[in-house]
Amino acid sequence: MKDSIKDFVPFERVEPDMEFINNVVGIAEESGYELKKASVFCTPSIAAEYYHLEEIKEFDTDLIEMETASLYLMADLLEMPTVALLVVSDNSATGAALVGRTEEEQRKYDYGRNVVLPTMILKTADAK
């Protein structure tokens, strides 16, 4: 955690606790799930990523989203390891829409949200 809010640097690269991340990936593998590690550009804005999409792509990141920024800030404040388990809903870089998915895409998305994500949360919490 920064000593002063004045020390905050926007767009600072944050590295997760890889030992914790690898433990969570191991839990997923033991459960028969495949987790993909990805670089995430986190922004607290709900719309700025569209205006700045080309600039954000220069960060060579895999995902852009909003909520993880707050999650990692709180983990830093509480000095706790954390992992963002994300189910990707849309992709503004490729044009994959939030709506209009094929039946198979919707089935995979629903399975991730309704089965994999809750299972991983519970198993990760039990492992602590």
What label would you give each PLM region?
Residues 1-128:
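Glycine-rich phosphate- or other oxyanion-binding loops that anchor nucleotides, phosphorylated ligands
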